[in-house]
Amino acid sequence: SNIWNWAHEVRPTQPLTSCLDGSIGDSIIELNKNKSDIITFHTYEAKKFKPTIQELLKIGRPLICTEYMAREYGTTFEFCLPIFKEQNIGCYNWGLVAGKSQTNFSWKTILHLNERRDKGEFIEEGDKLTEPEVWFHDIFRKDGSSFSDAETNFIKQILHGATNE
């Protein structure tokens, strides 16, 4: 509360926000909701996507979704971007180019890690790491090629009305 009060006293030129997701405890979430100039949130599950947005729109402040795209949970660009556009919600996704952080791999990749290690299901240093069939995050490979040309064409189309025809 003191930090919010100080921040509002300073009155920076940019809006203040603290993401509702990742905040611990109902009182902190409520404080962040009440004090933020812009409501920032993230949601990865398709079934919770629209209800979450409908609830947050009731607050009456601009919304920015700071994390949303997880293909295996149904929150694809094709699913999310039309909703953001229709509701005038800002967004950015986690991951652009598959790289060091390996966010093209699912959270499930590390499940049962010890059992997989015991079975020898790990690559050795110098072995080529094969990409997952369905990427979790990220859009491009290191060489600049798309994970999915259809997906990148959709993004271009919804943002600019452009296509690669």
Regions found by a protein language model. Give the residues of each.
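Substrate-binding clefts and catalytic carboxylate motifs of secreted carbohydrate-active enzymes
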Residues: N2-E165
